[in-house]
A protein has these predicted regions:
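Noncatalytic modules at the cell exterior or secretory-pathway interfaces
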Residues: 76-86
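Extracellular ligand-binding interfaces
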Residues: 1-78, 92-105
Length: 105
């Protein structure tokens, strides 16, 4: 199921990890829009990934909840948002707890 996020302006979520977050640790968040055809690799997909580190704002932290609230415009490669279909996390912390994932205005 895809989400129409065209009216939304920001992405928000909270994360917590017990793992070390000092450099070179990174936590990446990718949003993917499947395009009007709603199909992965359908030729009209767009995506963008942001990277968090101990030096970014917000900063990764060990054993503390971190609120990530960023404008969707920070996902510069995400040129359309009418068919959001994937939210992908990757990075160095092996254990990450995620809560309160939402899009808002």
């Amino acid at each position: 199921r895809v989400i129409d996020a065209t009216a939304m302006t920001s992405f928000r979520m909270d994360i917590w990890t017990p793992d070390p977050t000092a450099a070179p640790a990174v936590f990446k968040i990718k949003l993917v829009d499947f395009g009007a055809n709603g199909t992965f690799a359908g030729g009209d997909d767009v995506e963008h990934e942001i990277t968090l580190t101990a030096a970014t704002t917000p900063a990764l932290a060990t054993r503390g909840w971190v609120t990530i609230d960023v404008p969707l415009s920070a996902f510069t490669g995400l040129t359309t948002r009418a068919h959001l279909a994937q939210l992908i996390f990757s990075g160095d912390p092996k254990t990450v707890y995620v809560d309160n994932v939402l899009l808002h205005r």
